[in-house]
Amino acid sequence: MSLSNETKAKIVADFGRDANDSGSTEVQVALLTAQISHLQGHFSEHKKDHHSRRGLLRMVSQRRKLLDYLKRKDVSRYTGLIARLGLRR
């Protein structure tokens, strides 16, 4: 259920400051968004997988915390990121 290394590298290249920038807030949010999207497809087929649903809720909570942090620190980066990812708020 995790993302492939190629997908992760592409996300890091798209959202990071350079090819090795895997720790910036934007990259972390983008990776979590990709994992959340992947899990949503999983739940359409496996409706009773409550163990994975708990992991999904944890990822959503972590993404929310990172977005709140980014909004506090730099509003322009926050608005640009949610526009690029197509998130609400």
Curated annotation (Swiss-Prot):
Keyword line: Ribonucleoprotein, Ribosomal protein, RNA-binding, rRNA-binding
The keyword Ribonucleoprotein belongs to this UniProt entry's keyword annotation: yes
Biological process (GO), any one: translation
InterPro entries, A to Z: Ribosomal_uS15 (IPR000589), Ribosomal_uS15_bac-type (IPR005290), uS15_NS1_RNA-bd_sf (IPR009068)
Coiled coil: none
Molecular function as annotated in GO: rRNA binding; structural constituent of ribosome
GO cellular component, as recorded: cytosolic small ribosomal subunit
Assembly behavior: Part of the 30S ribosomal subunit. Forms a bridge to the 50S subunit in the 70S ribosome, contacting the 23S rRNA.
Function (record text): One of the primary rRNA binding proteins, it binds directly to 16S rRNA where it helps nucleate assembly of the platform of the 30S subunit by binding and bridging several RNA helices of the 16S rRNA. Forms an intersubunit bridge (bridge B4) with the 23S rRNA of the 50S subunit in the ribosome.
Similarity-based family: Belongs to the universal ribosomal protein uS15 family.
Name of protein: Small ribosomal subunit protein uS15
